[in-house]
């Protein structure tokens, strides 16, 4: 048997080690749930009635503007930061019409006390970083601190809807394709309030 030269052997071992670590990292990623509803709560925080009210609120916005908005609540994003997870969810769900690219995603990692708003490129002029930050700071964070998650999300949808309605009208189109890459998005940390998981 012919032995490999030491430098080649060391390089091969390093590549195997990197491949194993890369595979382990992907194995640890939180799965993206199927888009079975415009509101998906994997934390059992929202009541059935609260989820229904949010779904109806979002459905009305979509009927009026065509824009597609969804909310995802998870306990934690585990080893992945919420920015990366939010992008994976947005890319998988492909929110937004093909002609308009008008998708918005709200992600809440409850136990991590983090939230994020992903905005498709076509809505960046209406939902700027500053406007999204105000929605997070003024609507979501105060309500979340008081354990009023439904109220915070409803208020956020109202404000996002107001911004979306400022976008130029686009003819209705329901075909779902991969949207243009979104900007980094907005994220924030909220402080634990009563009843909020540590």
Regions found by a protein language model. Give the residues of each.
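Bacterial N-terminal signal peptides that target proteins for export
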Residues: 1-13
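Basic polycationic patches enriched in arginine
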Residues: 10-11, 183, 194
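Hydrophobic alpha-helical context, especially transmembrane and signal-peptide helices
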Residues: 5-7, 18, 147
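Bacterial N-terminal signal peptides
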Residues: 11-24
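Single-pass alpha-helical transmembrane signal-anchor segments
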Residues: 190-198
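General helical secondary-structure elements
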Residues: 6-7, 22, 34
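Folded, non-transmembrane soluble domains that reside on the lumenal/extracytoplasmic side of membranes
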Residues: 26-191
């Amino acid at each position: 048997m012919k032995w490999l030269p030491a430098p080649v052997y060391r390089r091969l071992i390093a590549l195997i080690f990197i491949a194993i670590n890369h595979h382990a990292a992907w194995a640890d990623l939180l799965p993206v749930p199927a888009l079975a509803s415009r509101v998906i709560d994997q934390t059992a925080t929202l009541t059935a009635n609260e989820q229904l009210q949010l779904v109806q609120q979002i459905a009305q916005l979509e009927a009026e503007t065509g824009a597609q908005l969804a909310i995802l609540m998870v306990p934690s994003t585990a080893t992945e930061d919420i920015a990366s997870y939010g992008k994976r969810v947005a890319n998988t769900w492909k929110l937004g019409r093909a002609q308009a690219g008008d998708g918005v995603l709200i992600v809440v990692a409850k136990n991590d006390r983090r939230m994020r708003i992903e905005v498709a490129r076509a809505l960046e002029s209406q939902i700027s970083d500053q406007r999204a930050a105000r929605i997070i700071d003024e609507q979501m964070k105060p309500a979340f601190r008081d354990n009023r998650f439904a109220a915070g999300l409803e208020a956020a949808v109202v404000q996002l809807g107001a911004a979306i309605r400022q976008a130029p009208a686009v003819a209705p189109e329901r075909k779902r394709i991969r949207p243009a890459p979104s900007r980094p998005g907005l994220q924030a940390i909220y402080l634990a309030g009563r009843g909020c998981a540590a």
